[in-house]
Amino acid sequence: MTTLSPENSLSARQSASFILVKRKPPIDKTEWDSFFDESGHLAKSRDFICVNILERGLHPFVRTEAWKFLTGYFSWQSSQDERLTVDSMRRKNYKALCQMYEKIQPLLENLHRNFTETRNNIARDIQKIYDKDPLGNVLIDKKRLEKILLLSYVCNTQAEYQQGFHEMMMLFQLMVEHDHETFWLFQFFLQKTEHSCVINIGVAKNLDMLSTLITFLDPVFAEHLKGKGAGAVQSLFPWFCFCFQRAFKSFDDVWRLWEVLLTGKPCRNFQVLVAYSMLQMVREQVLQESMGGDDILLACNNLIDLDADELISAACVVYAELIQKDVPQTLKDFFL
């Protein structure tokens, strides 16, 4: 067991306070540009920028460019000229992947049953997406989205297609202009978040660590969840598979949380602290009504239209509480 530094706890509490008080507005284009010198090299530290993103967020006009740094699409050490070269390379690589896919598609159709099944699943999922805004304007191109999802499935050997990827990819398509940007940002997002939303890689680990965290911080609640509420925590896998996007009131709230996850602030695997904070929202009701697993799951599924800043702030407070304690090595290794 290791006690973590109180300075980290103070920093996390300060971040939580900054988020709610909103002492400064989100980082806008003028401020973002001030982070770089004339050649496009970073003039501020990466840590400084990431802490500001945690505490303040990004203005929508900045998000596209900032996410390219946060995901690793661009190196933080690159110049403007180097970034132009990298973007051109990523465009060419995407085009080459598309050409490769067109060549091997007949082979995949004939030899791999999983390919045909997955392609049909993607097509069905795409049709479920509501692609218009309240005024009836078309938001996304479903054909382009389907193509990118298929290519992602064929090229990504680690993260097979799963339900939820279509909604996640849609948010990337809404953020950027070009298909190669959508494709690469999604791949880098999965890598940067340690595949935490992928069922066969990160989701089970998240659920196990969520149970461990509840046991450590809230033994009374943990006892109920292990008894009458058995199975409830393991049933929360959609939170991680969809990266919480169905819990928020707007796309901006989803992007706000995701960009915090990308900063790695205030810690790694922040998504588990977010899930813990959401469970705390139903805790009193669960205990007072002595809910069973199905009712707990229903109460959790009713957590919608959440405010991202409030949830991020609550999770920062949980982290501050956690690191003041004698933390088990498993939790320390997971969050640090």
From Swiss-Prot:
Main location group: cytoplasm
InterPro entries noted in UniProt: Rab-GAP-TBC_dom, Rab-GAP_TBC_sf
SUPFAM superfamilies (UniProt xref): Ypt/Rab-GAP domain of gyp1p
PANTHER family recorded: TBC1 DOMAIN FAMILY MEMBER 21 (PTHR22957:SF489), TBC1 DOMAIN FAMILY MEMBER GTPASE-ACTIVATING PROTEIN (PTHR22957)
Subunit annotation: Interacts with ACTB. Interacts with ARMC12, TOMM20, DNAH7 and RAP1A. Interacts with RAB10.
Function summary: Acts as a GTPase-activating protein for Rab family protein(s). Essential for the establishment of male fertility, and is required for both the production of normal sperm number and sperm function. Plays an important role in the formation of intact mitochondria, outer dense fibers and axoneme within the sperm tail. Essential for sperm mitochondrial sheath formation and for the interactions of ARMC12 with VDAC2 and VDAC3. May be involved in acrosome formation and cytoskeletal reorganization during spermiogenesis, possibly by regulating RAB3A activity.
Protein name as catalogued: TBC1 domain family member 21
Species for this entry: Homo sapiens (Human)
Phylogenetic placement of the source organism: Eukaryota, Metazoa, Chordata, Craniata, Vertebrata
